[in-house]
Amino acid sequence: MTLGGVGYGTKIDYVQVSHSGDDAYEWFGGAVNAKHLISYRTLDDDFDTDNGFSGNVQYAVALRDPLVADQCSCSDSNGFESDNDGSGSTALPQTSAKFANVSIYIANGTVDKKYRSAFRIRRNSALSIYNTVVNGAFPKAGLEL
């Protein structure tokens, strides 16, 4: 589900994305709030924020298959991925979303080599994550800044 510049007047509640060929949820700017999100067996990232997204996301779960990951040479698979923009500039508004009450699960077994981090927060992002649990191993890092 890709959201570009969606404002806070929009309500997103009880949405499931399954078997996505890219990110389950990606926000490019905007300030929309979302609740009760499920990401199931997606290829790329579960929750990806960019370009000044400043909304709040609460009550989300990601269920990952350890053998299903993005095989593109230009990408890898993360629970969270967040950038201010592609170059890491100080452009405003800054990506400053807040996530709370999130659970990420990777099933037991050998994890595909394209998995990277549970939390990949980079390029001048100011993402905040509260009360969140990860169950399973991301091979590169749990938290990558």
Annotate the PLM regions.
Residues 1-22, 26-145:
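Extracellular beta-rich repeat passengers
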